[in-house]
């Protein structure tokens, strides 16, 4: 029985990549069916034949299917690293001609919304397609909707929509003329010479202004502006969603794994094998110190009441109860630290998995942060820099570091080491202050000199 369960579990894990790819392929088929049935094969929302409520319904369905495709493809990429995939060109006995493949796709698209009795036949047709064919079909369907979230789009969009300070590092005058001269020499004919002379004579700001006026007078200016706003909104939504995932998912993993996985496991081991979760040397010293203080206080009270210095049965029972109480107290602290360490490691693995899977979202997040930071005024940038430097490396920062390290030691279940805390406070803020100054001198002074001037004026 146990072997059959393990074999089924192993088979389910090994089939996870293909199952995720099939689910993403089904979502792409649903989008394609809506396009063919209601939009004559065009993109959803491209024509104005439908009313506002109908268009809104189709947009909701589109976003739902695109979200399903993103999640299943991310699951496909993550599970492919741990499972062995079949040959991408030999995944089943599929059709060999392009006409048969087209007929098969058409049949699957036509039956995508049929009842559950026909789902097995559609599933067989989908399995007949190879992995590359499914991925190609998904890319073909989502290409017109997923452009803002591609890896190259956020970079180009962020460069085109970023403020002026981002372009300053790309304006050295010593290398630009040489590259233009090389292009003139490499070209054939005399048509490139006026272009080089024009670029050398006229400032770039005039050329940018002329191109901006030409874009504004274009007949497609409104559509381009709307498209830019849509792309900016998409980048913002993707960035906020990814930040929430990075913050919430590891935190939930830490809490749930500690309370429902590692907590019962450590408690069971502690009850069964107490030596596995034994008290550390520091906790033993603290328990003995507290026990000696309790014992001396009892002797002091007995001396005040002129009682016999010999211990009676009641006093011995009190000492025994106090020893058991101290043992439970420090054993709980020791086991809580072990639970926190295991849960923190698991949440760190989840965080690393999110970073590995969401590489495209990281590119979008970079462009979003660039627009957000460089869109601030110089005084706002200087205020943020002063706030961070004063909090982490300022005059009152040692007290904050001391509290932070003390809470970290309690979280890990280890006693506070004052020598380590004082040594850390004496070295790490100094290194952090040097890093801040180097960043301001090397990067911020080159990108936004006005912010550096404002920062120095406010700091003085």
From Swiss-Prot:
Q: Where is this region: Disordered?
A: 82-128, 143-190
PANTHER family per record? CHLOROPLAST ENVELOPE MEMBRANE PROTEIN (PTHR33650:SF2), CHLOROPLAST ENVELOPE MEMBRANE PROTEIN-RELATED (PTHR33650)
Query: NCBIfam families this protein is in?
Result: PRK02507.1-5 (NF002706)
Ordered alphabetically, the record's keywords are: Cell inner membrane, Cell membrane, Hydrogen ion transport, Ion transport, Membrane, Transmembrane, Transmembrane helix, Transport
**What InterPro entries does the database record attribute to this sequence?**
CemA (IPR004282)
| Protein role | Required for H(+) efflux immediately after light irradiation to form a rapid H(+) concentration gradient across the thylakoid membranes. Together with PxcL, contributes to transient H(+) uptake following dark to light transition.
Compartment(s) of residence: Cell inner membrane
- Supply the source organism for this entry: Synechococcus sp. (strain JA-2-3B'a(2-13))
This entry's Gene Ontology molecular function terms read: proton transmembrane transporter activity
The UniProt entry's sequence similarity note says: Belongs to the CemA family.
Q: Point to the regions of Polar residues compositional bias.
A: 90-102, 151-163
Instruction: Please note every region of biased composition (Low complexity).
Output: 107-120, 171-184
Query: Where are the membrane-spanning stretches?
Result: 242-262, 337-357, 373-393, 420-440
Name this protein carries in UniProt = Proton extrusion protein PxcA
């Amino acid at each position: 029985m146990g072997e059959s369960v393990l074999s089924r579990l192993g088979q389910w894990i090994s089939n996870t990549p293909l199952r995720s790819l099939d689910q993403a392929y089904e979502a792409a088929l649903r989008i394609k069916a809506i396009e063919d049935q209601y939009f004559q094969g065009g993109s959803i929302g491209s024509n104005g034949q439908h009313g506002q409520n109908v268009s809104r319904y189709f947009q909701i369905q589109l976003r739902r299917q695109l979200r399903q495709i993103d999640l299943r493809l991310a699951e496909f990429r993550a599970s492919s690293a741990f499972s062995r995939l079949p040959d991408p060109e030999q995944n089943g006995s599929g059709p060999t001609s392009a006409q048969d493949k087209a007929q098969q796709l058409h049949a699957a698209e036509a039956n995508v919304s049929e009842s559950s009795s026909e789902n097995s036949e559609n599933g067989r047709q989908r399995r007949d397609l190879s992995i590359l064919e499914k991925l190609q079909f998904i890319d073909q369907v989502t290409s017109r909707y997923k452009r803002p979230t591609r890896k190259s789009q956020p970079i180009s969009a962020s460069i085109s929509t970023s403020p002026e300070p981002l372009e300053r590092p790309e304006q050295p005058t010593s290398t630009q003329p040489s590259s233009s001269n090389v292009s003139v020499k490499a070209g054939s004919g005399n048509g490139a010479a006026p272009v080089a002379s024009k670029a050398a004579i006229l400032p770039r700001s005039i050329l940018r202004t002329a191109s901006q006026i030409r874009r504004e007078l274009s007949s497609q200016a409104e559509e381009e502006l709307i498209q830019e706003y849509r792309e900016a909104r998409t980048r913002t939504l993707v960035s906020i969603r990814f930040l929430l995932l990075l913050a919430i998912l590891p935190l939930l993993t830490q809490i749930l794994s500690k309370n429902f996985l590692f907590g019962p496991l450590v408690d069971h081991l502690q009850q069964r094998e107490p030596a596995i979760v034994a008290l550390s040397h520091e906790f033993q010293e603290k328990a003995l110190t507290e026990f000696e203080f309790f014992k001396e206080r009892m002797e002091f009270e007995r001396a005040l009441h002129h009682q016999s210095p010999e211990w009676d049965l009641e006093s011995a029972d009190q000492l025994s109860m106090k020893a058991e109480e101290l043992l439970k107290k420090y054993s709980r602290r020791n086991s809580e630290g072990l639970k926190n360490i295991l849960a923190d490691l698991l949440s760190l693995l989840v965080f690393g998995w999110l970073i590995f899977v969401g590489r495209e979202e990281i590119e979008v997040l970079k462009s979003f942060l660039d627009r957000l930071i460089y869109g601030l005024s110089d005084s706002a940038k200087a205020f943020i820099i002063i706030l961070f430097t004063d909090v982490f490396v300022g005059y009152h920062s040692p007290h904050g570091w001391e509290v932070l390290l003390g809470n970290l030691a309690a979280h890990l279940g280890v006693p506070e080491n004052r020598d380590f805390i004082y040594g850390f406070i004496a070295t790490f803020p100094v290194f952090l202050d040097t890093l801040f100054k180097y960043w301001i001198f090397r990067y911020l002074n080159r990108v936004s000199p006005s912010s550096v001037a404002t920062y120095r004026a406010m700091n003085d």
